[in-house]
Each structure stands twice: as structure tokens, then as C-alpha cells.
UniProtKB/Swiss-Prot annotation:
This protein's name: Uncharacterized oxidoreductase C28F2.05
Provenance organism: Schizosaccharomyces pombe (strain 972 / ATCC 24843)
GO annotation, biological process: arabinose catabolic process
InterPro entries recorded: AKR, NADP_OxRdtase_dom, NADP_OxRdtase_dom_sf
Taxonomic placement: Eukaryota, Fungi, Dikarya, Ascomycota, Taphrinomycotina
Gene Ontology CC annotations of this record: cytosol; nucleus
């Protein structure tokens, strides 16, 4: 069964998110994702497409007057190279200029790489938020001990934590911790970068529900209270992935999928959640 998850606002609930890392035609893909009901776009400073994403969102809202800009969330992230109070402070200002927005929707710290700098960066984001330049702030690739560090300093916890999560790496203890502290969990690589899409157990469920393996994995995340971030390079794939919101997995199948956990990491050379 799906555990408790925070849902105070439309953004703070589990939903499909569209990732724009290395998209060749970012602007058009974002337009197409929005047209299919996606309302969270996941970008980052290192992706170099914040401006394209914001322009696509603005144009979509202009063409669809019933959709307001505040109905859509654009996430960006502070890279390791810009950690530290001053660098993070300036990075936020630069993102504001790139997007032309008076206030950023969501800003995350991309990883906990630098022990001292990550706290300085967190303080910078808190101050920007206090002064009205950011709506919500969060982190990415933070494990429980990284979050405990924030608590030990008497600082507010992040609203969002974006980590690798899938049926093959379902982090039960971590998930419970985040939910108990009111932290929304977003999943990158929920489709395991394709490495587990041919798993026979997954294919069996795909056949049972008449859905793609990707649909099954995305649906699993949603029913765990996690917001999966998927990437697709064509309208057809975006349309196919959105179908994950149109069905439910039986509780018994969810329980079975819970047993698939093997702590699978799709990119072992970059796994910052294990950093001290």
C-alpha cells in the first residue's frame, strides 16, 4: 500500500515530472509534455536550458489561458562547482535573470559533495527564500545523515529531496524518514536508464496490465508516494509515459515489487548519496 506522503499543495504531492537533461529540442518537448498534463519540469544550471524551459512554459500558458504560470513548477539545481554561500547566492540571481522571473519556483542543491559548502549553500537558499526570490528549496542526492546534519544545525529541512529511486532501488528506510519529516521525494532514473526494462518479472506485469514496462515502473513510484522524473525524446514516448497516471497496480503486485529491491544504481560512477 502507498505510505503517507505530504500533499499540502498541488506541487507537494506525487506526480509525473518531465526531465530535460540533454534534450535536443528542449523547448518543443516541454510544450508537448505540458500539453499532456505534466506540470513539473526538472532542469538544472548544468543542463543549460533553464531559459528554454521557462520560455516554453510562458508560451504554453499564453496559448492556454485557463493554465496559469503558478500552476506549473520549474525546478533548477545548484551544481557542485557553485556551492558555498556567495557562489550559490549569485547562481540564484543568474537563474532569475536567465528565466526573467522575479521568483524561482524550486531550487535544489544538486549533491552533498562538499561538507562545509553544502551548508553554506543551504543557508544562501534559505535567505533567498526568506527574501522572496524562491518559492521552495530542496536538495538532491541527500541521504539520511545529510538531512540529520541540517537538523543538528537547527536549520529548516528541505521541502524536496531528489534521489535515484525505482522498484529496483526502493529505499524503504530512507522513504519513511523523508515522509515522516514532510519531505517530498522525487525520483530520477525511475526507469533504471533502461537497464532493467527487460526484467522478466517486469515483463510479466506489463503483460498482466497491458501497459509498457515503463508504465509499470512509473506507476510503482506514484503509488509509493514518490514523484518520478522521466525523460523522453519524442512526443510518442511522452504520451506513452503519461499513461502511468491512468491505472493502478494491485496492492499485492506492489508488495511483490517491493521485494525486487537490489539497491540498483544506474550510474555507479556518480552516486553522491553515499558521500559522507
Amino acid at each position: 500500500m502507498k505510505p503517507f506522503s505530504p500533499s499540502q499543495t498541488n506541487f507537494e504531492k506525487e506526480q509525473l515530472c518531465f526531465g530535460v537533461y540533454q534534450l535536443k529540442d528542449c523547448y518543443q518537448q516541454v510544450i508537448e509534455a505540458l500539453s499532456l498534463g505534466i506540470r513539473v519540469i526538472d532542469s538544472a544550471i548544468t543542463y543549460r536550458n533553464e531559459k528554454e524551459c521557462e520560455q516554453a512554459i510562458q508560451d504554453f500558458c499564453h496559448q492556454n489561458v485557463n493554465i496559469k504560470r503558478e500552476d506549473i513548477t520549474l525546478i533548477t539545481k545548484i551544481p557542485d562547482s557553485l556551492q558555498g554561500f556567495e557562489r550559490t547566492w549569485k547562481a540564484v540571481e543568474q537563474s532569475l535573470r536567465r528565466t526573467g522571473r522575479p521568483k524561482l519556483d524550486v531550487v535544489l542543491i544538486h549533491s552533498p559533495k562538499w561538507p562545509v559548502r553544502r551548508i553554506e549553500s543551504w543557508r544562501a537558499l534559505l535567505q533567498h527564500q526568506k527574501e522572496g526570490r524562491i518559492n521552495k528549496i530542496g536538495v538532491s542526492n541527500y541521504n539520511i545523515h545529510h538531512l540529520e546534519e541540517i537538523i543538528s544545525l537547527g536549520l529548516p529541512l528541505p521541502a524536496i529531496n531528489q534521489v535515484e529511486f525505482s522498484a529496483f532501488n526502493n529505499r524503504p528506510t530512507f522513504l519513511s524518514y523523508c515522509f515522516n519529516h514532510g519531505i517530498l521525494v522525487q525520483a530520477f532514473s525511475p526507469l533504471t536508464r533502461g537497464y532493467r526494462l527487460s526484467d522478466i518479472r517486469l515483463l510479466d506485469l506489463s503483460l498482466k496490465y497491458n501497459k509498457t514496462p515503463a508504465n509499470i515502473l512509473l506507476r510503482y513510484c506514484l503509488q509509493k508516494g514518490v514523484s518520478p522524473i522521466f525523460k523522453a525524446s519524442s512526443f510518442v514516448h511522452i504520451h506513452e509515459n503519461v499513461k502511468a497516471e491512468q491505472f493502478m497496480l494491485d496492492p499485492s503486485d506492489m508488495d511483490v515489487m517491493d521485494t525486487w529491491d537490489e539497491e540498483f544504481v544506474s550510474k555507479p560512477t556518480w552516486n553522491p548519496i553515499i558521500l559522507p
